[in-house]
């Protein structure tokens, strides 16, 4: 399967997720779980630490985002990641059947 075909399939799934309302439900669940686990606070602290470093005084948002994003993604608790992935898999299994 070509990359173009994979991109088309991904776009169709995303469109269906949005139109069915499942995207909003999964997104809300993810945000709630991240909030409950203190992820937003931890990422905020990480960004603040980066901004306070002397060599980052003129840091742009885009550069700060690029610096913090990999660490922020790795800080998502495994149980949250697994729970959301399970919801997505269940949704896909329903759609494919």
UniProtKB/Swiss-Prot annotation:
Q: Which UniProt keywords apply?
A: Activator, Chromatin regulator, Cytoplasm, mRNA transport, Nucleus, Protein transport, Transcription, Transcription regulation, Translocation, Transport
Q: Which GO terms describe its cellular component?
A: DUBm complex; nuclear pore; nucleoplasm; P-body; SAGA complex; transcription export complex 2
Q: In Gene Ontology terms, what is one molecular function of this protein? A: transcription coactivator activity
For this protein, the record's Pfam families field holds: EnY2
GO biological process annotations for this chain's record?
chromatin organization; mRNA export from nucleus; protein transport; transcription elongation by RNA polymerase II
Primary location class: nucleus
Compartments where located: Nucleus, Nucleoplasm; Cytoplasm, P-body
Q: What is the role of this chain? A: Involved in mRNA export coupled transcription activation by association with both the TREX-2 and the SAGA complexes. At the promoters, SAGA is required for recruitment of the basal transcription machinery. It influences RNA polymerase II transcriptional activity through different activities such as TBP interaction and promoter selectivity, interaction with transcription activators, and chromatin modification through histone acetylation and deubiquitination.
* Self-association state and partner proteins as the record states: Component of the nuclear pore complex (NPC)-associated TREX-2 complex (transcription and export complex 2), composed of at least SUS1, SAC3, THP1, SEM1, and CDC31. TREX-2 contains 2 SUS1 chains. The TREX-2 complex interacts with the nucleoporin NUP1. Component of the 1.8 MDa SAGA transcription coactivator-HAT complex. SAGA is built of 5 distinct domains with specialized functions. Within the SAGA complex, SUS1, SGF11, SGF73 and UBP8 form an additional subcomplex of SAGA called the DUB module (deubiquitination module). Interacts directly with THP1, SAC3, SGF11, and with the RNA polymerase II.
The UniProt similarity line reads: Belongs to the ENY2 family.
Q: What is this protein called?
A: Transcription and mRNA export factor SUS1
> What organism does this protein naturally occur in?
Meyerozyma guilliermondii (strain ATCC 6260 / CBS 566 / DSM 6381 / JCM 1539 / NBRC 10279 / NRRL Y-324)
Q: Which gene encodes it?
A: SUS1
């Amino acid at each position: 399967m070509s990359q173009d075909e994979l991109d088309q399939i991904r776009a169709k799934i995303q469109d269906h997720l949005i139109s069915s309302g499942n995207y909003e439900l999964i997104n809300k669940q993810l945000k709630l779980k991240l909030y409950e686990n203190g992820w937003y606070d931890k990422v905020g602290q990480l960004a603040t630490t980066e901004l306070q470093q002397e060599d980052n005084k003129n840091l742009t948002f885009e550069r700060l985002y690029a610096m913090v994003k990999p660490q922020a993604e790795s800080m998502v608790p495994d149980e949250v990641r697994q729970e959301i992935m399970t919801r997505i898999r269940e949704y896909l299994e329903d759609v494919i059947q």
